[in-house]
Swiss-Prot record:
FAD binds at G20, A21, G22, H23, A24, G25. Keywords: Cytoplasm, FAD, Flavoprotein, NAD, tRNA processing. Its cofactor is FAD. This is tRNA uridine 5-carboxymethylaminomethyl modification enzyme MnmG. GO terms for biological process: tRNA methylation; tRNA wobble uridine modification. SUPFAM superfamilies: FAD/NAD(P)-binding domain. It comes from the Bacteria. Coiled coil: none annotated. HAMAP family: MnmG_GidA. Homodimer. Heterotetramer of two MnmE and two MnmG subunits. Gene3D superfamilies: FAD/NAD(P)-binding domain (3.50.50.60), GidA associated domain, C-terminal subdomain (1.10.150.570), tRNA uridine 5-carboxymethylaminomethyl modification enzyme MnmG/GidA (1.10.10.1800). NAD-binding protein involved in the addition of a carboxymethylaminomethyl (cmnm) group at the wobble position (U34) of certain tRNAs, forming tRNA-cmnm(5)s(2)U34.
Amino acid sequence: MIESKNQSFFPNRFDCVVVGAGHAGSEAAYISSKGGARTLLITMNLDTIGQMSCNPAIGGIAKGHMVREVDALGGIMGKMIDNTGIQFKMLNTSKGPSVWAPRAQAEKKEYQLKVKHTLEAEKNLSIRQDTVEELIIENDQVIGVRTGRGFEIFTNHVILTTGTFLSSLVHIGTYQNENGRMCEPTVKGLSKSLAKYNLKLGRLKTGTPPRIHKNSVDLSVLTIQEGDSNPSPFSFSTDKITRKQIPCFITYTNAETHKLIHENLNLSPMYSGQIQSTGPRYCPSIEDKVVRFADRERHQVFLEPEGYETSEIYLNGVSTSLPEEVQWKLVRSLKGLENAEIVRPGYAIEYDYVDPTELKPTLETKKIKGLYHAGQINGTTGYEEAAAQGLVAAYSVLHSLRNLTPLLFKRSESYIGVLIDDLVHKGVEDPYRMFTSRAEHRLLLRQDNADQRLMKYGYDLGLVDQKSYDCMKEKYERVNSVREKIYQIPLKPSDKFQNLLDQKGITNYKFGMKLDSFLKRPEIKIKDIEFMIPEVSSWSDLEKSILEMEIKYEGYIKRELETIQWKNKYLDLAIPEDINYEMIAGLKKEAIQKLKSHKPMTLEKASQISGVDPSDVDLILYHIKGKKKQEVEIF
């Protein structure tokens, strides 16, 4: 260790130290410094700040919702992808609006550099290349960190965002190496430091697919997948996406692929016993897919370009840790990839995590004051889940530094609230991934209204500027004003209206009925009736969507709000000891197993069991109260 007197020539005291510069660390460092805290970000490699370690994409089902929420709260992920995306799509538009979700392919290296440059521009943020090997604790309070090169940095607030680097081990067949990502060193000392203070550590596994050379693929025989013609931005501050979009492609596994995998399962670290830790349930390896879904004749594989100029293509759906020579055979068994060249092999990686039930809802550890965890160290998977946690941890630090009451995100107001509540109360048994099904109030948590739900918190901390906040308020004032007008406008005969009726094939209507009732018809969109409310013609697509959703689904929204109040009354409701969960129609098999094992005494305790979703708790409540689910079903 370098003596303190030799450290006087450089700053070694900060309000907050963030360890790790992935998606959790980048958000944490940005929010902390933007909020006025003198912040130090420590990363083992400045060139990998904000790196996309796995898929080159941001967003997706529920994940896109969280990116919008992070943006509304002042975070950077939404802005970064808007500036570096190469294909944008709104997913699930054929379903209800609660599950619509933005997703974008990224120009991978450009995204990483954009994050790095954004952080470098923050005046309250210092960035240093080093590792953190040990926490410095006194009287159960963190007072600093000790780095790999022996320097001591002092602070009362540390946010650990260590990703997959804690005592990590890479597997490719029988090959093993102590890496945190392929060819990047692991960090062992920090795991020992955490265990020293009796934080409960566990072991998880994740994986990544091989990358192939674009010029070795016959794209002409593959199914093309284009982006949206009018793409939706992630950030509420982005007016329009103008970047050139490029396509992705789709192929499928086949009988030859599956035969090859079965013949080599004994060489897979997950099936040979080499890997003992648990992998992500909802993002299985191709080996797991073939074994678990043996009745499936094929599995979809997306070919996702990693940028405009690079030749690398990401094979989404073929995560594997089979030996490299088997990976070549596997990839070349796919249509269009018969001559494919692998430039990076797929691999599995095991790493330490800390049981998230060790945390408060602020993401501060219960045992060590001032120590916060965010990202994969909490047992989650995904860039978006990590970014959300990094933001929450930094919010908590800012509230602590300002002696403010901690901000606790509610399940009823955000997916971030669902994420944090699930982690700290239920813990994890496998890497946690967010889904819309985890949110019981998802119709209220649409991706289009994240700013209305959350921006006030960012504004209060100075993380959202006055102009952005005023624009948000003015937007919803416009929406509310026109919505009230629509309630009053009667349908009247006109040539334009008759043309609309003829176009839609509508005959069952009455003149005099109000416009809101007409808009609630499934075949009618807000764009169809703009001639009756001309003021909306200048609105953004997002504003029009909000207006349409709030009118079309106002009955469901009202019932959802009533349901929140109704359910809150029954959290302490006792569950009968003799309840037969197998007799409750619709209850998931996993939930039945967990409920029978844990034997919760109340609905609240049932809701805190990992694997028991809000919809399962609803079914139990309806069963106990003797109500039929369809009588109170939430949209």
